[in-house]
A protein has these predicted regions:
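Bacterial N-terminal signal peptides that target proteins for export
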Residues: 1-9
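Compositionally biased, low-complexity segments enriched in small residues
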Residues: 3-4, 19, 221-222
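Bacterial N-terminal signal peptides
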Residues: 9-18
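A "functional boundary" signal
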Residues: 22-240
Length: 240
């Protein structure tokens, strides 16, 4: 990165707390978070693959603490975990920072971040590095804990990660059963599930492969209807 580029970035960064872009302001209102915190969070995301995000995430954590925003503190800790997760070559750091996120989330009663870190970072890390058996072991521990607590958010993450594990293992029937569990839980309790569209699309693909066209069409219709992003819409259309 050139010196000039660093200077330009520094100038832009210094203006963040003076001029908040309209889009960021609107998104901050939607997510019910202070606009300056949200703007700085966006900067963290822009630098997610760079080592500088480690110090930036610390800053975000302390900024959030000053405003007594425990949710954004959890986001800050998760951002640091994200850096190591996407590096893909530092397992000890992934394990350590997963534990940090889980501990903070448990202490502040934020199951969303607790189970996200466990499922979508630690367990997915094991899957990405070809260790599906270790991933399954962790997922079974997570499932047991979520069941004991009757934590619907935790169960949602468990069902989703179980479907991914069994897909990797080429156990398509079992994978589809876990996807169906995820869908039923989401619909029954009207849970927040940003990627539910992908689950419908994957289930539709299973139905198509197993010559169940009517079920496939219904799942695809729901995939399109619940799409929350352009990538969701693309996956749903590809499943047709």
């Amino acid at each position: 990165m050139s010196q000039l580029y660093r200077i330009i970035l520094g100038c832009i960064f210094s203006l963040l707390f003076i001029v908040i872009p309209a889009k960021a302001q609107k998104e901050a209102e939607v997510y019910n978070v202070d606009s300056s915190l949200y703007a700085y969070y966006q900067r963290c995301q822009e630098n997610l693959l760079e080592p500088v995000v480690l110090s930036m995430s610390d800053t975000l954590f302390h900024m959030a603490a000053e405003q007594n925003d425990q949710r954004m503190q959890a986001v800050a800790l998760s951002t640091r975990l994200d850096y190591y997760y996407y590096q893909g070559n530092n397992e000890d750091s992934v394990v350590f920072h997963t534990s940090k996120v889980k501990q903070f989330a448990k202490e502040t009663l934020q199951p969303k971040y607790y189970y996200f870190a466990w499922a979508n970072r630690l367990i997915l890390y094991y899957l990405k590095t070809g260790r599906s058996n270790i991933a399954l072991y962790e997922a079974e521990k997570m499932l047991k804990e979520a069941q004991e607590e009757d934590n619907k958010t935790g169960l949602l993450y468990c069902y989703n990660i179980m479907s991914q594990i069994y897909t990797i293992k080429n156990f398509d029937v079992m994978a589809s059963e876990w996807r169906q569990k995820e869908i039923e839980l989401t619909e029954k309790y009207k849970l927040e599930n940003y990627n539910i569209s992908n689950t419908y699309a994957q289930l539709a693909s299973y139905y198509t492969t197993h010559h169940q066209p009517e079920l496939a069409v219904k799942a695809l219709e729901k995939a399109v209807r619940t799409a929350n992003s352009a990538s969701h819409k693309i996956l749903a259309k590809l499943a047709y």
